[in-house]
């Protein structure tokens, strides 16, 4: 028999215990296993679209530009085009190319309630310092500072690209994207070979690579120091 401690209730049949367990216990189920073929296709299609968006959207400005394209393809228009708003209007407003607000105008005023969905557009990255370029040992490097919660050791010896915008004195904007195309040069942060890294490997994981070490190689040449002198 099965008896509950501190209770007068006694369950003699184990099947009763299983029945109670099935009724009262939270059951963990794999949400993937009961999906149909059509549902799986929809899941993969959605994931592919999201991956493509992420591949094209690596900075706030790129995210906003791509979000604008998606919004306009779904009937949204800049609020600057409207003198008055009507029920059902779909509008957006872009703030300095780095944040975006979208709204669908409802039937009642905001005092009756409002539904808000928020998402952030920033992500962990390395930002170039104001005067980033320096030369050491025939190599040109970029000085950086990291943004967001990063595991610094994950950023070494992998191909990196540079994304951003340069504003010239006359106000002209030049958008920069180097390293994503297969024909582009890539940037990388060097690390020590295992047989040279005994001291480094004795450190704690978070200390093995410091923030000051996250300086990508931007150029290398036998006469790099002469080239830099002419920049």
What are these model-derived regions, one by one?
Residues 48-89, 94-96:
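TRNA-binding/sensing appendages of the translation machinery
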Residues 19-60:
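N-terminal capping segment at the start of a domain
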